[in-house]
Amino acid sequence: GPSRLYDHAAFKWNDNRRQSPPLSGAILYEMHLGTFTSGGTFDAAIERLEYLSELGVTNDELMPVVEFPGKHGWGYDGVALFAVNDLYGGPDGLKRFVDACHAHGLGVLMDVVYNHFGPVGNYTTKFGPYLTGRHCTPWGDAVNFEDSGSDEVRRFFCDNALMWMRDYHMDGLRLDAVHEFM
């Protein structure tokens, strides 16, 4: 399928000295980017950050923003977990959003889904034992975190988590439905 290269070093961050707000006593705003503004993009959401600050919000928790099939969705059926959804503004849009949040004193947490893949467009099983039938979730076979071949599967998800923190300056991750891991 289609793919592209992205140079993370080309983006010029302004938040080099950012300090994440403490999570103790935090006031989170869970944001579905596609419905937060009429534009449904990172850039449109930047225009409303002052409003969140005025509400007393300390951390913005983004619902999943990875690529998913179709034009509308909650993001919980992601299939390209390393790709920021282009409809929202792609990698640069997310970086501008995080940079702007930090400029407003807002931390950014990202909701990640590591317990299942979306039902359409998931090709990970063609490349390795990403799923196991030993345990099923409400969405189908569970992700293989414990069976044969699971070392590389775990590395895939660890690399993904590190990418969000390192390359997108996330202040934390919220793991969806951890009770479904095993």
What positions do the PLM features span?
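Substrate-binding/active-site clefts of carbohydrate-active enzymes
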Residues: 11, 16-23, 28, 32-182
